[in-house]
Amino acid sequence: MYAKRAKEIFDEEIHELEKLRDSINTTFDQVVEVLYHCQGKVVMMGIGKTGIIAHKMAASFASTGTPSIFVNAAEAVHGDLGMINGKDVAVLVSNSGSTNEILNIVDPLHRLGCTIVAMTGNLDSPLAQRADYALSIHVDEEACPLGIAPTTSTTATLLMGDALMV
């Protein structure tokens, strides 16, 4: 019974990931070029569950030799922006694209001269509109039947991060 449900969850997530894969466009190419030519470090930022994924992304980029750090978006405006400069590329991860903690750091990052890449499930969001580049991590449905735990969206974010890294 549980094994059957587990397979259904796999199938649901795979279906959403295939749709996301098919939506990848030339913006992805542009972001890869920006990351490749970054003269500073790649700064991954997020909060909550997307922050956990962004932290993993920073660690993976660092594993491949790309200078990368994670900065919690909520801490950024309380002094942690001091470790960021205009040579850095900031990757802001927010499924909704309207999280206040993320939006509050966009203007300070622009003032520092950072290139901003948004990874969001909503390309019409304030974050996507204010970023230099916006990558979709949109999924139509979460695998969580209650709709309260990010499941498919975090998997999609993790996979997009891995695709950027390798």
Residue ranges, per PLM feature:
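Glycine-rich phosphate-binding loops that contact phosphosugars or nucleotide phosphates
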Residues: G40-V166
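An N-terminal, well-structured beta->alpha segment
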Residues: M1-G40
